[in-house]
Amino acid sequence: MERLAGRIILLSGVSRTFVGFLAGLLAVLAQPPFGIFAAAFVSFPVLVWLIDGVAPDPGDGLLRRLMPPAAIGWSFGFGYFLGGLWWLGNALLVEADAFAWALPLTVVGLPAVLGLFYALAVVIARSLWSDGWGRIAALALGFGIAEWLRGFLFTGFPWNAIGYAAMPMPLMMQSASVVNLSTINMLAVFVFAAPALIWTGKGARAGLAIAAALFTAHVAFGFYRLAQPAPAPLQPEMTVRVVQPVIDQAKKLDDRERASIFEDHLSLTAAPVQDGAKRPDIVVWPETSIPFILTDNPDALARIADVLQDGQVLVAGAVRVEDAGAGLPPRYYNSVYVIDDRGQIVGAADKVHLVPFGEYLPFEDLLTSWGLSSVAASMPGGFSAASTRPVLTLPGGRRIYPMICYEAIFADEVDGNARLADALLNITNDAWFGDTPGPRQHFHQAQLRAVEAGTPMIRAANTGISAVVDARGVLVVVLGYNYRGVIDTILPGKLPTLTNIATRSQIFWLTTGILFLVAAISRLGFNIRKN
C-alpha cells in the first residue's frame, strides 16, 4: 500500500486529474442506494495522496500555484457529482421533445459547476498543507467550508453532502441530534481521510487516534440512543394513512388523465384499513397529487367530502393560484392543502425553496430571450416562492411542519418552528427521476430531518419512498419504490432535543476554528522544519 501511495503522489498532469476523477466517482458508492461505507475510506486517502504530490514553485504567481490543487479538487468533485447526480437527466426525458437538448447541461454541466466547490475545498486545504496529521485537519476544514457554502450559495444545493455518507443507517444518524450537518461534513472527511496517515505522514498515531475516537463516539452514541425506549405514540393517538399512487409522470402531464388520477387517489383513501390498524385520522397525498386548480373545482371538493369519514382530514399537494391584480398574470404556488370532512380548505402552505430551472427560471427575462424555459413553463412565470413556511394546524389541534419536495434536503429549513409541530411533513413527486438512485438519496436525506428535529416525519411520495419515520430516524412503516398502496400507522411522539439550532451553529464554528488552528500550527511547524 505504501508503494501505491507513492505512485499516486508522483502522478502529475492528466494522470493526476483522472485519478482524482476516479476517486470522486468511487466516493459516490458511500451514498444511497449503495451505502458502501468503506468506499469513502479509500477515495479520501487517495485524495490526500494526490494533494501530497502538489509541489508548486515558490517563484510562480498565485494563479499558477492555485491551479494544481484546484484541478485535483475539481476533478474529484466532478466525478463525485457526475456519479451521484446523473439521474437528474431523467426529468428532461419525460418531455424529451422540449427538454432533451438540455441533457448535457444537466448531466455534465451541473457536476462541472458543483465541482468548483470541491476545487475551493482543496485550495483551502493545500494552503495549510503539511506532512503531518494536520493536513487531514486542513482537508476537513476545506470541505467543511465548501459544503457550508454549497448549502446556500446560488439558492443552495446541498444534495449528497459528504456527511450523509457517514450516516447510512439510523444507528449512525444519532449524532445529528447533537451537531448539525455542516459539522458532520467536516468530521466525516477527517475520519474518511485519516487512513492516508498509515502509509504517508508524521504524527500518524495522533491523527488515527482522533479519527478512531470520533468514529467510536459516533457509533457508540447511536447504540446508546437506539437502546432507549422508542418514542411513545403521540397522545391522544393519531392514526395516519399515507397514499402512494405510483402514477407515471407522463400520465400526470396528460390533461385527459386528470379525472382518473384524482379518482385513483380517492379510491386509495377509501381503501379498508390494514390488519390491526385504526381508522385513519389524517390522510396524506403526495406533492401535486390534485391534478387541477382545486379552488376552481367545487365538485372535486365535494368528492373529497364524500370519501372522507367524519372527523378525517386530508393533507394533499396541489397547485394553488392567486390573483396578482389587474393586468398581471396570476401567481402559481406549489402548495399543500388541509381539507376537512366537509370538503372545506381549512389550511394551506406554499413552497418556499423552489427548484431553479424546474419550478422557475432564474434571470427569466434574459434567458427567455435566448429561448430557454423552465419545466414549469406551462404556467406564466413558473411558480412563485412563498416568503415564510407556517406550521399548519389541523382540525383537532394537531400541528404539522410542511416541506415540499426537495425542501427536505436543506437541514437549515428545519428551524425552530419545526419543534412547534407534532410531525414534519414531506410530500414529493419523484416520478420525474424514475427508478434511479435519486429517490433513494432524497428519502435518506429527508430521514435525517426527523433526527435533527427530534420530531417524527410523515412522507408521501407519488412513486415512493413513502414512510413514517420516528424521531430517531427509525422507519415505523415504509412503502418501497414503485409499490402502489397505502400505509396506516399510529404517529409516534417527539423526543427532547439535546441541543438547539443556535448551539449547533456555535459547535460548527468552534469545530471550524479548532481545525484551522491544528492545520495552521502544523503548517507553521512544517515550514520551520523545511527551512
UniProtKB/Swiss-Prot annotation:
Name listed for the protein in its UniProt record: Apolipoprotein N-acyltransferase
Domain CN hydrolase: 243-493
GO molecular function: N-acyltransferase activity
Broad enzyme group: transferase
Keyword Cytoplasm: no
Localization annotation: Cell inner membrane
The enzyme's E.C. designation: 2.3.1.269
GO cellular component terms attached to this protein's record: plasma membrane
Family: Belongs to the CN hydrolase family. Apolipoprotein N-acyltransferase subfamily.
Pfam family, one: CN_hydrolase
Biological processes annotated in GO: lipoprotein biosynthetic process
Membrane topology: Multi-pass membrane protein
Pathway given in the UniProt record: Protein modification; lipoprotein biosynthesis (N-acyl transfer)
Domain of life: Bacteria
Known function: Catalyzes the phospholipid dependent N-acylation of the N-terminal cysteine of apolipoprotein, the last step in lipoprotein maturation.
